[in-house]
């Protein structure tokens, strides 16, 4: 069963208080609880891995502003931030709160973690974008405002399956066919399935369901970019659409077998492909790679000593 929680990302805090904490370590007596908290805050700072730190002069701030592990660097370089892109960054909420005049509210409505900002500024809610937001708190707001829901958008929201089951007459079945949390519901209503759209559904069970109905022709353009279809793609390399495979977040081991087929602009931003990216450093796209969260690592406490 597809678990939508796997898309929820943990955002670690900024390290702006490092200097003051160092003073506490050097000049103050503190209890064990203080020490544990300080060590924990240090262990949560992200820094560039050595290779990318050596190429820091190539930073593209527009793409870096989208990188959820780049908050520490962005906080120290606020004049270089692309604020529209930052509004889409799920780990940038505190930085946005500190700069309300820079907020693009339409983009924040689609930000997984933007719900607290919207609760503080309810007049800024855009109901179309909020209908696409998978945060459970967004779903709670939508439940309380049925008349404002965009049902076409909500139909593909994996966190909204309970609302949809209670409002079957409002479902957009084409959009629902994309919903990774709707497979059981779709199986109960096979005549409503859009068999072209279900080929883009990232739930692996969607591909199994497709294969159980050979009367519906596989569209390899759509299937090739589906992360839930990777086993099917591995077994049918002659049918893969290589242009769309590169955007598939689970495709790196297959692409590794066919490096001449890679679109490096797309691959460079793929988190799961960092090992493949580092295998061909001369191929890196030095714009899109700065969006890749795995160009960062957690700094160890020893690096502060």
What does each model-found stretch correspond to?
Residues 7-305:
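Alpha-helical scaffold segments
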Residues 1-7:
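Extended intrinsically disordered, low-complexity segments enriched in serine/proline/acidic residues
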């Amino acid at each position: 069963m597809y678990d939508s929680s796997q898309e929820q990302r943990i955002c670690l805090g900024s390290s702006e208080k490092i200097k003051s904490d160092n003073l506490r370590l050097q000049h103050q007596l503190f209890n064990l609880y203080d020490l544990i908290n300080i060590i924990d805050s240090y262990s949560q700072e992200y820094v560039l891995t050595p290779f990318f730190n050596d190429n820091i002069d190539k930073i593209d701030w527009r793409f870096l502003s989208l990188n959820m592990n780049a908050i520490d660097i962005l906080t120290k370089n606020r004049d270089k931030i692309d604020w529209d892109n930052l509004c889409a960054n799920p780990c940038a909420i505190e930085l946005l709160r500190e700069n309300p005049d820079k907020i693009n509210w339409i983009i924040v409505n689609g930000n997984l973690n933007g719900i607290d900002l919207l609760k503080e500024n309810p007049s800024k809610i855009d109901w179309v974008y909020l209908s696409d937001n998978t945060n459970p708190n967004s779903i709670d707001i939508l439940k309380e405002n049925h008349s404002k829901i965009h049902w076409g958008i909500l139909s593909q929201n994996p966190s909204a399956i309970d609302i949809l089951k209670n409002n079957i007459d409002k479902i957009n079945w084409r959009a629902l066919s994309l919903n990774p949390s709707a497979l059981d519901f779709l199986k109960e209503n096979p005549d409503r399935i859009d068999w072209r759209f279900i080929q883009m559904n990232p739930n692996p069970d969607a591909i199994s369901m497709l294969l159980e109905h050979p009367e519906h022709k596989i569209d390899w353009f759509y299937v090739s970019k589906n992360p839930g279809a990777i086993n099917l793609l591995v077994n049918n390399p002659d049918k893969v659409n290589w242009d769309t495979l590169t955007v598939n977040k689970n495709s790196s081991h297959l692409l590794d077998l066919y490096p001449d087929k890679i679109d490096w602009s797309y691959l460079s931003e793929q988190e799961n492909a960092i090992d493949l990216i580092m295998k061909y450093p001369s191929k890196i796209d030095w714009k899109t790679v700065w969006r890749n969260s795995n160009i960062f690592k957690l700094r160890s406490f020893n690096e502060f000593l």
